[in-house]
A protein has these predicted regions:
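A short beta-strand motif characteristic of beta-propeller blades
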Residues: 32-37, 73-82, 120-125
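Short loop/turn segments that connect beta-strands within beta-propeller blades
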Residues: 27-31, 68-72, 115-119, 167-169
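Residue-level signal for WD-repeat beta-propeller blades
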Residues: 7-8, 17, 27, 48-49, ...
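Blade-level signature of beta-propeller repeat domains, shared across WD40, Kelch, NHL, RCC1
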Residues: 133-169
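A short loop-to-beta-strand structural motif that recurs across blades of beta-propeller domains
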Residues: 21-25, 62-66, 109-112, 159-165
Length: 169
């Protein structure tokens, strides 16, 4: 099941395969498809940073993982929680100009940010409770937006879909 797709700055198409624990790439010139097994379970959404490295959610493992296509190396970053495993990162996106990975925390009613250069985390509590955010997107100034799922409605406190505007602290 392909689940998540992005294009790196070099034009290569990358995708995650959720139930096979793989990521893959498609060379746009040759059409060649390359599959790579991941050392973690449940690769879900992935995005590329400005340097062409991929950031991938490890949904059932409470982590995000960086993959460097140049070295084929995976580097794991556990979400900053105690106890470990207490959140499920459904999706992420990379604010390329600022080098920040934004991660949806679906059991904590929050978003996490990961500063790529410093490898440091921040946690941003959301103004709503019992949320299940699905993705993150940005304005040019770095303001982030996340959406609360609308289906099934019991995922959210009042059953209403919501768009939330978030500023990084």
């Amino acid at each position: 099941l392909p689940y998540g797709i992005d294009i790196t700055p070099d034009g290569k198409v990358w995708f995650a395969r959720l139930h096979t624990d793989e990521i893959g790439s498609i060379d746009p010139d040759s059409g060649k498809i390359t599959m790579i097994a991941t050392p973690f379970r449940g690769p879900r959404r992935l995005r590329a940073d400005a340097a062409g490295k991929l950031w991938i959610t490890a949904f059932p493992e409470s982590a995000i993982v960086r993959f460097d296509p140049a070295t084929s190396r995976f580097t794991r970053f556990d979400l900053p929680l105690s106890p470990k495993g207490g959140d499920t990162p459904y999706a992420l996106n990379v604010d390329r100009p600022r080098g920040i990975v934004w991660v949806n925390g679906n059991q904590s009613d929050s978003l996490y940010t990961f500063d790529i250069a410093n490898e440091t985390w921040a946690n941003i509590p959301l103004p709503r409770r019992v949320t299940f955010t699905r993705d993150v997107e940005f304005e040019p100034d770095g303001t982030a937006y996340t959406a609360i799922a609308h289906f099934p409605g019991w995922h959210v406190e009042d059953g209403q879909s919501t768009l939330i505007r978030v500023q990084r602290p």
